[in-house]
Amino acid sequence: MSTQEATPRDDAIRLLARRDYSRSELMSRLAARGHAPDDIASLLDALADEGLQSDARFAEQFVRSRLSRGQGAMKIRAELGARGVTDEVAREALEGEAPDWHRLACEALAKRFDSPGRDPRERAKRERFLASRGFDFEQVRHAMAHAWENTR
């Protein structure tokens, strides 16, 4: 069966067999394959009812994946939002993992840099690194003060 002959359900099942997708991502991918928007909407409702597609499950897996990469809450929340996950579902997924954000920021910083830096320019570079990873100001300050305590 070629992609042109595949039903929206066939395409959705094929996509979901590889990994979870948010409802929004799945809708975009099915629309790109030429399926009618009305067919896609009813299919996504049916898949959710059957437990085959869940934004909550997608968000939980996404959060675990991003935490293992050393990313902060702000970046994870923004990426989930870009994938069409609601703020409430994103918040619940982050709370479900309950990571120690300060420890995670310290680990990410110590892994990337071997010292806090000798001058303000080097310290600013380290702070920008953590901010780009999605850590907030308090977490960045904590990491700059404590990231290398166990390595000395």
From Swiss-Prot:
Subcellular location: Cytoplasm
Cellular component annotations (GO), alphabetically ordered: cytoplasm
UniProt keyword annotation of Nucleus present: no
Main location: cytoplasm
Keywords tagged on the record: Cytoplasm
Domain of life: Bacteria
GO biological process terms, semicolon-separated: regulation of DNA repair
Family, similarity comment: Belongs to the RecX family.
PANTHER family according to UniProt: REGULATORY PROTEIN RECX FAMILY PROTEIN
Function: Modulates RecA activity.
Entry protein name: Regulatory protein RecX
Organism listed in the record: Chromohalobacter salexigens (strain ATCC BAA-138 / DSM 3043 / CIP 106854 / NCIMB 13768 / 1H11)
